[in-house]
Every structure is written in C-alpha cells, then in structure tokens.
UniProtKB/Swiss-Prot annotation:
Gene3D superfamilies: Survival protein SurE-like phosphatase/nucleotidase. Its EC number is 3.1.3.5. Belongs to the SurE nucleotidase family. The lineage of its organism: Archaea, Methanobacteriati, Methanobacteriota, Methanomada group, Methanobacteria. It comes from Methanobrevibacter smithii (strain ATCC 35061 / DSM 861 / OCM 144 / PS). It is found in: Cytoplasm. The gene is surE. Nucleotidase that shows phosphatase activity on nucleoside 5'-monophosphates. A divalent metal cation binds at residues 8-9, 39, 95. This is 5'-nucleotidase SurE.
Length: 258
C-alpha cells in the first residue's frame, strides 16, 4: 500500500509530520507539500509561473518534497512526477484549524488538495484539527501542537479505507477533530452554512490611501446535525462525505427553462 500526504500549511508544518507518523507503519508514505503557507488558496493551480520541486527533510529527518506552488500543484507533482504510480490513498493535513461549512469548502487548500487526488479516483481524506488560537496557522504551521488524537483517528480511517475503500458515490472525506474531544467516535455530519462571518477592515497607509484586510468572526448558528454544531457544541469528531460531482438537479432546470 502507498499513501501520498500533502497539506496547505506547508511542508514544515507540525500537522503533516503527525499525519505521516500516524500511518507510516501501515504503508509506504510519500510527503509532497507546498513550501510555504497556502491557507485559503482552495483548488488553485499555478499556470503562469515556473515551479520547482525541492527535496527536503521533515523534523524527524525523513524525506519529503517542497513544491513552490499550491496544494493542488503539490498533489499533481506527487502523482505524476514523484511517485510514479497511483497511491492507494491520499491524505491532506493534519490542518491547523477547522475546515467546516459550505461557504469555506472551496476556499480550503486542505480540501483542494484532497479534491485534486479524488478527481483521479484516489480515495482521499482531508483532516483538520481545531486550535483555540487560530492565528497560529499563519506562522507556517510550525508551532508545536498536539496532533496525537487526530493522528489516532486518522489511522483508524486509513485502516478502514485499506480494507474497504470508500463507499460508492463518495470521493473524499472531510474530517474535523475538536481540540477537546469527548470520545473516540466519529459523528457523521452534514455541512453547516459557513465557518466565519466575513469582516473587512479598512485602514490607511502613511500616504492616506486605503488598504484592506479580510477576516472574520466564528459563525455559531449551525443547526443540529451539522459539522459546526457537532464540533463546537458537542466536542465530537466529525466526518462529512463529499463528492466531486457538483451537478445540481438537472430536471429542475429543464422545468425552470420552460
């Protein structure tokens, strides 16, 4: 068995090392990730700049590859340049901070990497862990965080995938781990509305010209059964099954056009 591991926090992030350590005795592992922090880049691919693959080592001295591009670029290189053959599973993470809700789904580089692998028929898992101080993710993910529980839960899922694959019609799993989980079970949850309510901060530079920061406050209005509610209200680890087919109900549009 072979696994490709990537992320959007960067190849030196604590979470990607934790993911590797969690499963490396189950399969052959190849780590290919962006060289720098790529949070919020979504499923973007680099088309207008040359890219480099730089061999590197993780903090445990194991081999990895840093790509001067996006998470999708890293997965593309992993699949078609570095590994040489299709892996049995692709793991994106362990991400620093949640990836929940419909609105943020396509902006997440963590999920973007998993989507890219899933588009080639590879069972994929995007896994993220809550951190109280969400801003630390912008420190290139290198802050020491205890990902041991998330690693344990990831290992459990990888074993199931190796045994059964993913169910028909499911292309990838979006997995989120609370900082203080109540148990070692998963709650299967649907996507909530969003992760943040956007906030735009307007400031002035020394010459009086405006510039802006986009931020947000946590969204806390998700109803029961959603990923946000299960994670934030119940402290339960969640799995949300996803499909790359975004096609809506075609018959409704045919009727609508009449």
């Amino acid at each position: 068995m072979k696994a490709l591991i990537s992320n959007d926090d960067g190849v030196n992030a604590t979470g990607i090392l934790a993911a590797k350590n969690a499963i490396e005795d189950l399969c052959e592992v190849c780590v290919v990730a962006p060289e720098t922090q790529q949070s919020g880049i979504g499923h973007a691919i680099t088309l207008y700049d040359p890219l480099r693959i730089n061999p590197t080592t993780l903090r445990d001295k194991s081999q990895a590859y840093g790509v001067t591009g996006t998470p999708t670029d890293a997965v593309t290189f992993g699949l078609f340049e570095i590994m040489g053959e299709k892996p049995d599973i692709m793991i994106s993470g362990i991400n620093t901070g949640f990836n929940i809700g419909k609105a943020e789904l396509t902006t997440s580089g963590t999920i973007g990497a998993a989507l890219e692998a899933a588009s080639f028929g590879i069972p994929s898992i995007a896994i993220s862990q809550e951190v109280t101080r969400d801003y630390i993710k912008f420190e290139n993910g290198t802050v020491d965080i205890d990902f041991s529980f998330a690693g344990k839960m990831l290992r459990k899922l990888v074993k199931i995938v190796f045994k059964k694959g993913l169910p028909d019609g499911i292309d990838l799993l979006n997995v989120n781990i609370p900082e203080n989980p109540v148990d070692e079970e998963f709650e299967v949850a649907k996507l909530g509305n969003r992760m943040y309510t956007p906030i735009i901060q307007r400031r002035l530079d020394p010459r009086g010209k405006p510039y802006y920061w986009i931020g947000g406050d946590p969204y806390n209005s998700d109803c029961e059964g959603t990923d946000g509610h299960c994670l934030k209200k119940l402290n339960k680890a969640t799995i949300t099954p996803l499909t790359i087919d975004l096609t809506g109900e075609m018959d409704l549009i045919k009727e609508w056009l009449k």
